[in-house]
């Protein structure tokens, strides 16, 4: 008995073999695998039916145990045909002449403004270099008096100067006494080379230059009582005196 179904399948396979231009070789379990020279004219895709339709549920084939419906989709698109598709060309338009011209004019204006700023800065620097530097005005501060005389001291000094042989009083400071310094008064006729002459109300007094830092700003007074007649000093620079008041320290 001749199996017509199997012979019909072999005829179909032979037609496909001739149409594709490939060759077939035997596979396992009576199947045949097809090999083509880098050409794949069709593909078989296996898609199982997850949810059966209403008509399939009624059919007797679906009710048989152990059998599941299959679905094959044949796609004739190959990799070479997909790769042969050319991509779309991107469109590009060149700028017009007016746009290019306006851009060049804007660049020229910008460069011109930069050149003007540089020239102005250079000219300003040149002018500042040529002008002589201005000298700062010196503020005049009142000079502190080296020594001041009380009215009694002025009266006594005038009496000394009214003598036939006028005498000047020279004030200095010597290292003496308990505290370190003591006032030293001398009668002189002429001031020394480095002495300072102070004049107040027409009365002159000479101060030793070495004693300036010790007695600057002091006030000179004259005391005449039953115990003594002498000149005394009120010195703001004094930090302390001895018990007898003869010496002081600064």
UniProtKB/Swiss-Prot annotation:
* A single BP term in Gene Ontology: iron-sulfur cluster assembly
Q: Return the annotated region ranges for Disordered.
A: 54-89
Positions that bind Fe cation: 178, 242, 244
List the GO molecular function terms. Answer: 2 iron, 2 sulfur cluster binding; iron ion binding; iron-sulfur cluster binding
The record's PROSITE patterns line, in alphabetical order, gives: HESB (PS01152)
Q: What SUPFAM superfamilies does the record tag this protein with? A: HesB-like domain (SSF89360)
Enumerate composition-biased segments (Low complexity): 75-89
A further note on this protein reads: Present with 125 molecules/cell in log phase SD medium.
| Name of the protein described by the UniProt record | Iron-sulfur assembly protein 1
**UniProt source species:** Saccharomyces cerevisiae (strain ATCC 204508 / S288c) (Baker's yeast)
List the taxonomic lineage.
Eukaryota, Fungi, Dikarya, Ascomycota, Saccharomycotina
């Amino acid at each position: 008995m001749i199996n017509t179904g199997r012979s019909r399948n072999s005829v179909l396979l032979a037609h496909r073999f001739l149409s594709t231009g490939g060759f077939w070789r035997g596979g396992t379990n009576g199947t045949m695998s097809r090999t083509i020279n880098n050409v794949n004219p069709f593909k078989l895709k296996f898609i199982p039916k997850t949810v059966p339709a209403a008509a399939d549920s009624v059919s007797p084939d679906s009710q048989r145990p152990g059998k599941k419906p299959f679905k094959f989709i044949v796609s004739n698109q190959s990799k070479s045909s997909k790769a042969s598709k050319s991509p779309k060309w991107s469109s590009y338009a060149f700028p017009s002449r007016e746009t290019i011209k306006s851009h060049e004019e804007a660049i020229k204006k910008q460069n011109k403004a930069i050149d003007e700023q540089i020239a102005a800065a250079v000219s300003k620097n040149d002018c500042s270099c040529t002008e002589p530097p201005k000298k700062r005005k010196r503020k005049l501060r009142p000079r502190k008096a080296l020594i001041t005389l009380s009215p009694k001291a002025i009266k006594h000094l005038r009496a000394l100067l009214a003598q036939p042989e006028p005498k000047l009083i020279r004030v200095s400071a010597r290292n003496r006494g308990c505290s370190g310094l003591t006032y030293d008064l001398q009668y002189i006729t002429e001031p020394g080379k480095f002495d300072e002459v102070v004049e107040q109300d027409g009365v002159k007094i000479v101060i030793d230059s070495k004693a300036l830092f010790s007695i600057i700003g002091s006030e000179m007074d004259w005391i005449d009582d039953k115990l003594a007649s002498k000149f005394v000093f009120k010195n703001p620079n004094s930090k302390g005196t001895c018990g007898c008041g003869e010496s002081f320290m600064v």
